[in-house]
Each structure stands twice: as C-alpha cells, then as structure tokens.
Amino acid sequence: MNSGPKVSVIMGIYNCERTLAESIESILSQSYKNWELILCDDASTDGTLRIAKQYAAHYSDRIKLIQNKTNKRLAASLNHCLSHATGDYIARQDGDDLSFPRRLEKQVAFLEKHRHYQVVGTGMLVFDEFGVRGARILPSVPEPGIMAKGTPFCHGTIMMRASAYRTLKGYRSVRRTRRMEDIDLWLRFFEEGFRGYNLQEALYKVREDSDAFKRRSFTYSIDNAILVYQACRRLKLPLSDYIYIAKPLIRAFMPAAVMNRYHKKRVMNQKEGLVKHE
C-alpha cells in the first residue's frame, strides 16, 4: 500500500514566469491535502526556474523540482515528472492554468467510487487577458469515435490512475506528436480498452491568449491529420469518420483572425447550466 501522497500533480514548465506562482498557489489552495506537486523545468530562459526554486524550497515536503538540461518539450517533461511521481493518481496541470479549490477532492472521490474508470477529467473555463470568455464541457462518457472529431478529455484537467499511465508507458516524445502528445495518449488509451469520464462542471481554468492560433504551423496541421487518420484506422472507426482527416488541413489555411472568432464562438456556445465551478 502506498504510504506517500495519494495524488501526484505533474506540471511541465517553460518560460511561464508571469503565471507560474498563481498556478502553484491554486494547487496549494486545494481542499484535498494528500498530494505532491512535481515541477519539471524545461530549460526555461526567463525567471521560471527561480520562481519554481522558491516554492520548492518553501514547501520542500510537498513540491519537488526537477530539471531538463536542454529543452525537450512537454511530452519529455511530463515523462520526467512521471518517473518521480509516487501517487496512486496522477493529476495534470499547466503552468499558466488554474485549478478551483475542490478539483482534486472531487476527482479523487470519483476514482475511489468508480473503479472501472481509468481517468476523470473536468470541464474548464477559458480565459485570456480580458477575462473569462466561455466554457468547455466535453461529453461525460466519451467513446472512441470522438477521436476523429476532437479530443475526449481536456488534457490539463485530467486525473489518471498511475497504473494506467504505466500501462500506456507515459507520453510518446517524437516529432509527430509535438503539441499533440495528449491526442496520441488518448488514441493508445482507447486501444487499451480503457474508459474515462468527464465531470460536468468547470473545475479548471485554461489560459488561451489571443495569439493561440498564430502559433500553429502547417506542419502541425499535417501531423494532426495523420493522427486523425491513425485514430480512424486503429480504432476501426466507420468510413464516414475519415472525412474528419481534412479538418485540420482546412483550418491550416484559415486566417488566424477567422480561427479566433470561430473558437471564441465555440467556447461561448455552451449551456449556461453546465458552467459550474467550485
């Protein structure tokens, strides 16, 4: 039986000096207290490492700080965190996002009660420099078919059983999955026959600035299309789903301003009753 923390929160951090302290404070403020936070600095070039060191020194019993000697990107950083994690449950958080106080409490309670689920996600509020723009609430029980159309879980919100992460061997750190390590993870997750659940309330805040779509290259869109194709083939989805392979390619040719307007409309187009947070 694990005598250490029940939950390991893993956070890959890179050049997030403006937001890191607030993100860490949101974990320190959790109503659920049996956790450890593992930070992996990915060779930051700003003040991120200095801030992380301050928190790790002040909360040495709760916060572990590890470092990549060179910049290896998010998947490698998360795997580095996983190699140091001791919890039965692994929770994700990004260094520019926030968790509401009862997030960990509610996710632990769900996994303790529902042993047949390997992961539990939550809804999330989307915010930028101007405030909250909307919410994203995904289906409560996503089926493999969702992989052709979009993501089954909001990656930053998840809590997964450590045993499931071990079975999946963590994240694949290869060029094809850069910035899509979560999509690749969910493809392998469904291939393994695992099941997940999304709590129908927003317990997380994700920061999406106005330049989010300017940073997505055509190469990214090609790799995204390849992953959609692999999902259709490996999960044996119906032929009608193959049309979604074109979706990331179409988006690649859309002006960033158009994509931002579409995205803003999409996140705002949620049922108001679903946007609960505690």
Curated annotation (Swiss-Prot):
EC number: 2.4.-.-
GO molecular function: glycosyltransferase activity
Domain of life: Bacteria
Enzyme's top EC category: transferase
Transcription keyword on record: no
SUPFAM superfamilies in UniProt: Nucleotide-diphospho-sugar transferases
Keywords assigned by UniProt, alphabetized: Exopolysaccharide synthesis, Glycosyltransferase, Transferase
Pfam families: Glycos_transf_2
Gene Ontology biological process terms, A to Z: polysaccharide biosynthetic process
Stimuli inducing this protein: Repressed by SinR.
CDD domains: Glyco_tranf_GTA_type
Assigned protein family: Belongs to the glycosyltransferase 2 family.
Role noted for this protein: May be involved in the production of the exopolysaccharide (EPS) component of the extracellular matrix during biofilm formation. EPS is responsible for the adhesion of chains of cells into bundles. Required for biofilm maintenance.
Protein name: Putative glycosyltransferase EpsE
